[in-house]
Every structure is written in C-alpha cells, then in structure tokens.
Curated annotation (Swiss-Prot):
<comment type="similarity">
    <text>Belongs to the HisA/HisF family.</text>
</comment>
<dbReference type="Pfam" id="PF00977">
    <property type="entry name" value="His_biosynth"/>
</dbReference>
<protein>
    <recommendedName>
        <fullName>1-(5-phosphoribosyl)-5-[(5-phosphoribosylamino)methylideneamino] imidazole-4-carboxamide isomerase</fullName>
        <ecNumber>5.3.1.16</ecNumber>
    </recommendedName>
</protein>
<dbReference type="GO" id="GO:0005737">
    <property type="term" value="C:cytoplasm"/>
</dbReference>
<feature type="active site" description="Proton donor">
    <location>
        <position position="130"/>
    </location>
</feature>
<keyword id="KW-0413">Isomerase</keyword>
<dbReference type="InterPro" id="IPR023016">
    <property type="entry name" value="Isoase_HisA-like_bact"/>
</dbReference>
<dbReference type="InterPro" id="IPR006063">
    <property type="entry name" value="HisA_bact_arch"/>
</dbReference>
<keyword id="KW-0963">Cytoplasm</keyword>
<keyword id="KW-0028">Amino-acid biosynthesis</keyword>
<dbReference type="InterPro" id="IPR044524">
    <property type="entry name" value="Isoase_HisA-like"/>
</dbReference>
<comment type="pathway">
    <text>Amino-acid biosynthesis; L-histidine biosynthesis; L-histidine from 5-phospho-alpha-D-ribose 1-diphosphate: step 4/9.</text>
</comment>
<dbReference type="GO" id="GO:0000162">
    <property type="term" value="P:L-tryptophan biosynthetic process"/>
</dbReference>
<dbReference type="InterPro" id="IPR013785">
    <property type="entry name" value="Aldolase_TIM"/>
</dbReference>
<keyword id="KW-0368">Histidine biosynthesis</keyword>
<dbReference type="InterPro" id="IPR006062">
    <property type="entry name" value="His_biosynth"/>
</dbReference>
<feature type="active site" description="Proton acceptor">
    <location>
        <position position="8"/>
    </location>
</feature>
C-alpha cells in the first residue's frame, strides 16, 4: 500500500480544505516547496499536488509553484486540478510531472481522455473521481454529474484508463476515518487500479484499505491527517521543520505524546 502525501495549493500557499469547502481553508505553509521537501525527508515515494485555483478556473494559476516542487524532488509527482486540455497536460509533462490527473474533463469532455491516451501512456494519464454519496462532483466540487461513480469509471475503462483516484468527498478533510464501504463498493464495481483518497486518519484506516488490495486498491492519498500529526513517530518531521526555521505554531511542528 503506497502512501502518497498531498499538497493542495491555493493562491500560492499550501492549504487544506474541509470537504472541499473553500470557505474552510487552513494555511499550513506559505511555500508549498518547503512542504514537498518535508514529505521527501519523511521518505515519501510520490507526491500528489492539486492546484485548487485551477480546479475552479481551469487556468494553471500555480504552475510555477508546481515547477519548483518538481525541480527540487527526485520522486514522481502527480498533479491535478483544472486540467481540461491537451495543452495543459503537455505543459505539466514537459516540466517533469510524472502523472496528470483529469477530473472534471472526464465528465464534460471524455473525448479528451481518448485523445490523451493516443499520445501518452496510461501510467501518465489517470482519472480522478470525486464522489459524494456515489455521485461524481466536478468544477471544484461545485456541480454534480448525471451518472454514478462506477458508471463513470466504466466509461473511462473503455477508453483505456487503467487507474482511478477515488475521493470520498464526505470524508475528505474531516479526520473521521476512511469511507471503507464506499471505497470497497466502488473498487469492486470499477475493476481497475484504485488510489483511495479522503478521510484516512489512523493506522487502522490504512489496515482497512490494505484489505481492499484484492479489489485493486493499492495506494492512498493522505492530507490533513499527516499535517495534524495524527500518525505516530513523526518526531523526525518535527526535527526537520525546526531545521527549516518553520514557525512553531505550524500544526505539524507540535510534538504530540505519540511522538515521544
């Protein structure tokens, strides 16, 4: 089970949202690149980056921030958020992004997926399905699609997509545990490789997800739980942050009993 730390960028800063609500935004670091370095020091094997501004506007607002992350790390970076054209995909892949995540466009313009898979490998183009009670949400989670999550996955599979990043919106950023049954249901019906996202909060959640490997769930994206130091043995993280001179009020710079 591959653990993939998440970095969400809004107005150039590293933030986390609660259930995708832009009004419930918490800033963790002014420079997302510093966050990426911290993840790598914690032995991350891949980083998941989302341009939240682009998710709303469709414009690659935080492109330079993402370029900085790619340039400073030696591991694969996957990027999502408002990527709705071949040109946008090319722009990211040209700077060294390993994998591009297509979200809203998979619903509104499935032909884009077909075009991309004619040009790029399936490992470079993945589809993100962000669902609320089984219904995919698009355009920064502000609109609903007219199909079920597994139906969208089926259409993508026909086009040659091999992996879905599946986010349970009801769990995202809530620190209330992973949506095990929801993820299991989706993975069983999709019959594809699945990266789970949304709600993973404790090691128990990771064990639950690992039990879904037989259904294709082989990785998980974790955001707020890591930022809030919910997992044991994050003492190394704390020590490294002090070396960067990061403000002690930054949540993950607080020692917790689990780290002592």
């Amino acid at each position: 089970m591959l653990i993939i730390p998440a970095i969400d960028i809004k107005e150039g800063k590293c933030v986390r949202l609660t259930r995708g609500d832009f009004a419930q935004k918490k800033i963790y670091l002014d420079n997302p690149c510093d966050m990426a370095v911290i993840w790598r020091k914690q032995n991350a094997k891949m980083i998941h980056v989302v341009d939240l501004d682009a998710a709303l506007t469709g414009e690659t607002v935080n492109f330079e921030r993402i370029r900085e992350i790619v340039n400073v790390l030696d591991i694969p970076i996957q990027v999502g958020g408002g990527i709705r054209s071949v040109e946008a995909v090319e722009k990211y892949l040209d700077i060294g992004v390993s994998r591009v995540v297509i979200g809203s466009a998979a619903v509104t313009n499935p032909g884009l997926i077909a075009d991309l898979l004619k040009k790029y490998r399936p490992s470079q183009i993945v589809v993100g399905i962000d669902a609320e009670h089984g219904v995919p949400k698009i355009k920064g989670w502000t609109e609903s699609s007219n199909m079920q999550d597994y139906e969208l996955a089926g259409e993508m599979k026909k086009l040659g997509v091999e992996r879905i990043i599946y986010t349970d919106i009801t769990r995202d950023g809530m620190l209330q545990g992973v949506g095990y049954e929801t993820t299991k249901r989706f993975a069983e019906k999709a019959g594809m490789k699945v990266t789970a996202s949304g709600g993973a909060t404790t090691s128990d959640d990771l064990h639950k997800l690992r039990s879904l490997e037989k259904y294709g769930v082989d990785s998980v994206i974790i955001g707020k739980a890591l930022y809030e130091c919910n997992f044991p043995c994050q003492e190394l993280w704390y020590a490294y942050e002090q070396g960067l001179g990061i403000d002690g009020e930054f949540s993950t710079a607080r020692k917790k009993e689990c780290c002592s």
